[in-house]
């Protein structure tokens, strides 16, 4: 077998399977098939798109199948032919009406999830599968935010991106102008709002208060003084009222504490005065003694000098006398044994 011509195997043919090529045949302008060019031109199944006529034929065929099922069921029940034809025609009309309302998009969107979807797609035709796949791809693109007319490598095309940017700016300006026109028309049709009565009264009060006779600072001071006087008068008027027991006890304790502190301060004032006078006299005497301190210091130094000179002799005498002045050690452990009794003289 050579170039797709001949038998797949020479077994049983009685020949060696050699096929001689025809060199006299020459095909001018024949283009060699390339896989890359074929995929670019044709594309995948989703790029081709389903055939609308085939899909319409499949839907009509499903209608006729249901009508035939009804006819067979009625014939098995021994129903009259006229009644069978009438009921089948009625079913066909209702199904055709539903078919007219149902579009390709709705038919593609009505699919199940999970195993039911897989089985339904498996039993579908090629064009129905392509239609359902296109619908799913469109839904995914909307969820991700990809435009409908997207093409590969459009993001690297600067001219196209500038054109899209200018179109977006133009659309935004048009939308802004439309909003402004709508607001202007709404404002022109709506009557102006009437000012409330309070605003006019407050305005009149403000105009009357801003009179040139009284400057603003004096008016502010007079207002603060009037507020203080009103607060004092309200406190004086509120004093005769019976306060709560908690506040009365607090006030009574505070007044008793203040009276005790005052009496203590008064009783202690003579002592403090006497103490302050004593401290003043002591400070004066100290200052006088400090002023006389140089002479006393010189005298004390003179008086102390002989004592310092005599100190070695005293130290020596104290050292020599130190054994006598030392305290005796009580030796309780070393006790002398009792000696013999005294002897009487022989003459007695």
UniProtKB/Swiss-Prot annotation:
<dbReference type="GO" id="GO:0008380">
    <property type="term" value="P:RNA splicing"/>
</dbReference>
<dbReference type="GO" id="GO:0005681">
    <property type="term" value="C:spliceosomal complex"/>
</dbReference>
<feature type="compositionally biased region" description="Low complexity">
    <location>
        <begin position="172"/>
        <end position="184"/>
    </location>
</feature>
<feature type="compositionally biased region" description="Low complexity">
    <location>
        <begin position="197"/>
        <end position="212"/>
    </location>
</feature>
<keyword id="KW-0175">Coiled coil</keyword>
<dbReference type="InterPro" id="IPR013170">
    <property type="entry name" value="mRNA_splic_Cwf21_dom"/>
</dbReference>
<keyword id="KW-0539">Nucleus</keyword>
<feature type="compositionally biased region" description="Low complexity">
    <location>
        <begin position="308"/>
        <end position="321"/>
    </location>
</feature>
<comment type="similarity">
    <text>Belongs to the CWC21 family.</text>
</comment>
<dbReference type="GO" id="GO:0005737">
    <property type="term" value="C:cytoplasm"/>
</dbReference>
<feature type="compositionally biased region" description="Low complexity">
    <location>
        <begin position="223"/>
        <end position="260"/>
    </location>
</feature>
<dbReference type="GO" id="GO:0005634">
    <property type="term" value="C:nucleus"/>
</dbReference>
<feature type="coiled-coil region">
    <location>
        <begin position="81"/>
        <end position="106"/>
    </location>
</feature>
<feature type="domain" description="CWF21">
    <location>
        <begin position="55"/>
        <end position="98"/>
    </location>
</feature>
<feature type="region of interest" description="Disordered">
    <location>
        <begin position="168"/>
        <end position="348"/>
    </location>
</feature>
<protein>
    <recommendedName>
        <fullName>Pre-mRNA-splicing factor CWC21</fullName>
    </recommendedName>
</protein>
<feature type="compositionally biased region" description="Basic residues">
    <location>
        <begin position="322"/>
        <end position="332"/>
    </location>
</feature>
<dbReference type="GO" id="GO:0006397">
    <property type="term" value="P:mRNA processing"/>
</dbReference>
<feature type="compositionally biased region" description="Polar residues">
    <location>
        <begin position="101"/>
        <end position="112"/>
    </location>
</feature>
<keyword id="KW-0747">Spliceosome</keyword>
<feature type="region of interest" description="Disordered">
    <location>
        <begin position="101"/>
        <end position="135"/>
    </location>
</feature>
<comment type="subunit">
    <text>Associates with the NTC complex (or PRP19-associated complex). The NTC complex associates with the spliceosome after the release of the U1 and U4 snRNAs and forms the CWC spliceosome subcomplex reminiscent of a late-stage spliceosome.</text>
</comment>
<keyword id="KW-0507">mRNA processing</keyword>
<feature type="compositionally biased region" description="Pro residues">
    <location>
        <begin position="337"/>
        <end position="348"/>
    </location>
</feature>
<keyword id="KW-0963">Cytoplasm</keyword>
<feature type="compositionally biased region" description="Basic residues">
    <location>
        <begin position="275"/>
        <end position="291"/>
    </location>
</feature>
<keyword id="KW-0508">mRNA splicing</keyword>
<comment type="function">
    <text>Involved in pre-mRNA splicing. May function at or prior to the first catalytic step of splicing at the catalytic center of the spliceosome. May do so by stabilizing the catalytic center or the position of the RNA substrate.</text>
</comment>
<dbReference type="Pfam" id="PF08312">
    <property type="entry name" value="cwf21"/>
</dbReference>
<dbReference type="InterPro" id="IPR051372">
    <property type="entry name" value="CWC21"/>
</dbReference>
């Amino acid at each position: 077998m050579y170039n797709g011509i001949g038998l797949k195997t020479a077994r049983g043919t009685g020949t060696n399977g050699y096929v001689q090529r025809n060199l006299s045949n020459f095909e001018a302008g024949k283009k060699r098939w390339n896989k890359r060019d074929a995929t670019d031109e044709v594309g995948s199944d989703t790029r081709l798109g389903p055939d609308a006529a085939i899909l319409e034929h499949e839907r009509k065929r499903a209608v006729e199948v249901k009508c035939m099922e009804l006819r067979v069921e009625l014939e098995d029940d021994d129903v009259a032919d006229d009644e069978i034809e009438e009921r089948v025609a009625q079913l066909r009309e209702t199904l055709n009406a539903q078919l007219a309302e149902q579009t390709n998009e709705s038919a593609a969107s009505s699919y199940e999830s999970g195993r039911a979807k897989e089985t339904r797609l498996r039993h579908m035709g090629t064009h129905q599968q392509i239609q359902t796949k296109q619908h799913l791809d469109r839904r995914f693109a909307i969820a991700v935010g990809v435009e409908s007319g997207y093409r590969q490598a459009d993001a690297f095309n600067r001219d196209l991106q500038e054109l899209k940017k200018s179109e977006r700016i133009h659309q935004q300006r048009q939308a802004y102008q439309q909003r402004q026109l709508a607001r202007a028309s709404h404002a022109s049709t709506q009557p102006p709002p009437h000012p409330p009565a309070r605003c006019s009264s407050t305005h009149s009060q403000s105009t009357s208060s801003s009179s040139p006779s009284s400057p603003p600072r004096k008016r502010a001071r007079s207002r603060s003084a009037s507020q203080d006087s009103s607060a004092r008068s309200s406190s004086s008027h509120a004093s005769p009222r019976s306060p709560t027991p908690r506040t009365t006890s607090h006030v009574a304790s505070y007044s008793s504490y203040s009276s005790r502190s005052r009496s203590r301060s008064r009783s202690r004032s003579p002592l403090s005065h006497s103490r302050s006078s004593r401290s003043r006299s002591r400070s004066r005497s100290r200052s006088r003694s400090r002023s006389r301190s140089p002479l006393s210091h010189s005298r004390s130094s003179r008086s102390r000098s002989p004592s310092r000179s005599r100190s070695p002799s005293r130290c020596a005498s104290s050292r020599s006398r130190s054994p006598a002045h030392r305290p005796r050690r009580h030796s309780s452990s070393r006790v002398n044994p009792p000696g013999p009794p005294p002897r009487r003289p022989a003459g007695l």
